[in-house]
């Protein structure tokens, strides 16, 4: 890429991206893999610190990405078409940021060139969650956390 060329995430709309470009937008924060609670009356969404059983604790990536939808029926496959209808992506999510016309933050791997920057910036779930099978799923309200809703710096 020359200095005059814009990176693909600035030059293309989400629906124009190739599959590889689309997938590379995921920074690996894994906040979308946390169990979320929705208030039935207000629609307000709250994140817990309980993660999907398929989340790899070290990499913060899905341990069975190709088969995740079959193994976890609630898992959502994000696409440019359904992104508009998904309102629970965290404020730091690249898909959400770009949809809102914002740029990627400094710690995003496509900007920083370092996958670890997400973790070092404190934007990852790494070291801050329990797996579903380790948590008391009857006490989800006791596991509500606010850190996944931190906006990008």
UniProtKB/Swiss-Prot annotation:
Alphabetized InterPro entries for the sequence: Puta_zinc/iron-chelating_dom (IPR005358), UCP006173 (IPR008228)
SS bond list: none
Signal peptide stretch: none
Pfam hit, one: CxxCxxCC
Assigned protein family: Belongs to the UPF0260 family.
NCBIfam families: PRK05170.1-5, PRK05170.2-5
Protein name (record): UPF0260 protein Plav_0898
């Amino acid at each position: 890429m020359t200095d005059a060329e814009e990176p693909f995430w600035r030059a293309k709309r989400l629906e124009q991206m190739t599959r590889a470009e689309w997938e590379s937008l995921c920074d690996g924060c894994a906040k979308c893999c946390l169990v979320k609670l929705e208030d039935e009356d207000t629609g307000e969404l709250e994140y817990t610190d309980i993660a999907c059983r398929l989340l790899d604790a070290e990499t913060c990536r899905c341990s069975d990405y190709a088969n995740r939808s079959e193994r976890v029926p609630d898992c959502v496959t994000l696409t440019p078409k359904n992104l508009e209808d998904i309102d629970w992506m965290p404020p730091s999510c690249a898909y959400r940021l770009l949809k809102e016309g914002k740029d990627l933050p400094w710690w995003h791997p496509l900007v920083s060139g370092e996958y670890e920057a997400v973790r070092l910036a404190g934007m990852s779930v790494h070291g801050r969650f329990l797996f579903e099978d380790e948590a008391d799923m009857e006490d989800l309200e006791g596991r509500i956390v606010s850190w996944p809703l931190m906006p990008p710096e």
